[in-house]
């Protein structure tokens, strides 16, 4: 695996830290079942509507923030070669039957960001059957995309893809250039991951700034075509379910 674009940090979390994350994810999912506020997103599956994402998790969870700003930040700092600052975090749940994402590069979603790196931390085992990531290392430039922000098919077909399976507590570290995609979850259990994204500290790319801009972009995209999205680009392969409310910085689960 090309260390300039990706790396796997085996046992990125200690058993105690992983237990903390597992407990937090379960509790947050329980909050989502009773409320549509605080950045919860749902998708339609063959089993009915299911939660697929919660954004800005550490805004309401000091235990998750301690992981994002502690051991995970240390990994991001080592990869960036300078002090890292978290500007975004989310949990992707990928419930049974949950959809994956089409081939894309994160850099397209953050065109004004400086160098960035994201850590995808496995809460559950990420396997081929449960929809782990496929990556194409070695890319150091933006690839052409269609109007959804998805890498064009003829480019995708020419890339050398590698499957990355993770054990709980492992982390896949990726930069903004790395093309990646994932398949649907074909198992009978969730495939949850925490994704934390970092930029160099002092770069001006901050959590508040990112989520303010995201809210405006999401509202504009919905107004333009009437489609509710879970991402700023339309690279989600599933069918989103629009919530009654969305407030990613509201820090409320009541």
Task: Enumerate the language-model features and the residues they cover.
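Catalytic core of non-heme Fe(II) oxygenases with the double-stranded beta-helix
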Residues: 98-163, 203-213
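Conserved double-stranded beta-helix
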Residues: 142-179, 183-254
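A short glycine-rich, His/Asp/Glu-containing loop-to-beta-strand
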Residues: 7, 50, 89, 116, ...
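A structural signal for short, well-ordered beta-strand segments
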Residues: 89-91, 119-121, 194-198
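Short hydrophobic-aromatic micro-motifs
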Residues: 9, 119-121, 172-174
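Non-heme Fe(II)-dependent double-stranded beta-helix
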Residues: 1-4, 8-103, 109-110
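Short, solvent-exposed loop/turn segments at secondary-structure junctions
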Residues: 13-15, 92-94, 108, 126, ...
């Amino acid at each position: 695996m090309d260390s300039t674009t990706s790396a796997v940090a085996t046992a990125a979390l200690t058993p105690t830290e992983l237990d903390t994350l597992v407990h937090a994810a379960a509790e947050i999912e329980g909050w989502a079942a009773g409320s549509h506020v605080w950045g919860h997103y749902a998708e339609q599956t063959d089993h009915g509507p299911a939660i697929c994402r919660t954004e800005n998790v550490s805004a309401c969870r000091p235990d998750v923030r301690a992981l994002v700003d502690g051991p995970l930040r240390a990994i991001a700092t080592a990869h960036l070669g300078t002090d890292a600052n978290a500007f975004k975090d989310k949990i992707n749940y990928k419930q049974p039957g949950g959809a994956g994402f089409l081939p894309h590069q994160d850099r397209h979603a953050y065109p004004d960001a400086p160098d960035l790196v994201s850590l995808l931390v496995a809460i559950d085992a990420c396997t081929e059957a449960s929809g782990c990531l496929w990556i194409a290392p070695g890319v150091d430039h933006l690839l052409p995309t269609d109007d959804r922000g998805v890498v064009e098919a003829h480019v995708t077909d020419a890339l050398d893809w590698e499957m990355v399976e993770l054990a709980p507590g492992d982390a896949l570290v990726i930069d903004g250039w790395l093309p990646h995609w994932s398949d649907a979850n074909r198992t009978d259990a969730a495939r949850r991951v925490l994704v934390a994204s970092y930029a160099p500290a002092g770069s001006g790319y901050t959590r508040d700034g990112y989520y303010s801009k995201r809210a405006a972009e999401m509202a504009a995209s919905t107004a333009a075509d009437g489609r509710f999205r879970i991402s700023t680009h339309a690279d989600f392969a599933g069918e989103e379910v629009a919530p009654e409310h969305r407030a990613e910085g509201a820090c409320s689960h009541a």
